[in-house]
Regions:
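Bacterial N-terminal signal peptides that target proteins for export
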Residues: 1-11
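C-terminal segment of classical bacterial N-terminal signal peptides
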Residues: 17-25
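Gly/Pro-rich loop segments of beta-rich domains
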Residues: 27-39, 65-98, 127-142
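Residue-level detector of Asp-centered blade-edge/turn motifs that repeat once per structural unit
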Residues: 42-45, 104-107
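Conserved beta-strand positions in repeat-built beta-propeller and related beta-rich domains
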Residues: 50-54, 111-115
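A short loop-to-beta-strand structural motif that recurs across blades of beta-propeller domains
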Residues: 56-60, 117-121
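Surface loops at the rim/top face of extracytoplasmic beta-rich domains
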Residues: 114-117, 134-135
Length: 142
């Protein structure tokens, strides 16, 4: 039974990732037109968390509805693309530079923030983003 559930979860995640990569006719959220999904994981309630390297946020996807779960939209650069940043704070006040992958970890989720060279932790009970490991400095020592 557990194997069947894992297979169904994987299949649903794959279908969701493919559907997000294709342009949508009707934009229900910014994710439908500006998303660059790179990581995905399922949540206990059946929704999904998707990391978005373009918008610099983590989305929560439930059915055809998507809302920002972690991170904040930042100002655009010269070409209008979000810049991102680094800030450990509440979910709706935190900044990511390049959220790459997401995975369940302890009582929350680990998110690799590739451009900041850190792994961030989103705790379920605290609704907070905090750095779990790494340093913002580039190099092989972190």
């Amino acid at each position: 039974m557990k194997l069947q559930k894992r297979i169904l979860t994987f299949a649903a995640a794959a279908m969701l990732a493919l559907s997000m990569a294709l342009p949508c006719a009707a934009a229900e959220s910014a994710m439908d037109t500006l998303c660059a999904p790179s990581g995905i994981t399922s949540m206990p309630d059946g929704s999904f968390l998707v990391t978005d390297t373009y918008n610099k946020v983590v989305w929560r996807v439930e059915g055809r509805t998507s809302t920002v779960y972690g991170g904040v939209a930042t100002v655009g650069d010269l070409y209008g693309q979000p810049i991102g940043g680094y800030n450990d704070s509440a979910l709706n006040d935190s900044y990511f530079k390049e959220p790459w992958a997401v995975a369940p970890f302890l009582d929350g989720y680990a998110v690799s923030d590739a451009a900041n060279n850190v792994v961030r932790f989103i705790a379920h009970d605290k609704n907070k983003v905090q750095t779990a490991t790494g340093q913002r400095a580039k190099g092989s020592m972190n």
